């Protein structure tokens, strides 16, 4: 069963989403998911990271990604844009 709270990374392009998935492969478990409708930006593809992997996500993001991504905390289906520092 999936948790009610998780993190979602949305991307400006499909290329960026796929590149991030590859980059995170050995750093943090991610699942490809459609971007939530409540998030009105991006290419439509996002990466989901479970709440228990927050530390791994923060470490992976500290290594840098191309520009054009946004981070959201999803609680009960509602997205809140956050910064990496807020993890």
Each model region followed by its residue ranges:
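Residue-level marker of intrinsically disordered, low-complexity segments enriched
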Residues: 16, 26, 31, 72, ...
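NTP/phosphate- and nucleic-acid-binding module
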Residues: 19
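Arginine residue identity/basic-tract feature
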Residues: 2, 22-23, 37, 48, ...
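Short glycine-/aliphatic-rich beta-strand segments at the starts of folded cytosolic domains
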Residues: 1-10
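C-terminal structural segments of small proteins and small subunits
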Residues: 55-87
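Amphipathic, hydrophobic secondary-structure cores in small proteins
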Residues: 8, 14, 22-63
């Amino acid at each position: 069963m999936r948790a009610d709270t998780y993190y979602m990374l949305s991307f400006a392009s499909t290329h960026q989403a796929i590149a991030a998935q590859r980059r995170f492969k050995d750093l943090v478990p991610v699942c490809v998911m459609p971007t939530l409708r409540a998030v009105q930006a991006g290419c439509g593809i996002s990466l989901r990271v479970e709440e228990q992997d927050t530390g791994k996500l923060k470490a992976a993001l500290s290594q840098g990604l191309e520009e054009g991504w946004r981070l959201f905390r999803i609680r009960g289906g509602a997205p809140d844009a956050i910064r990496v520092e807020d993890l």
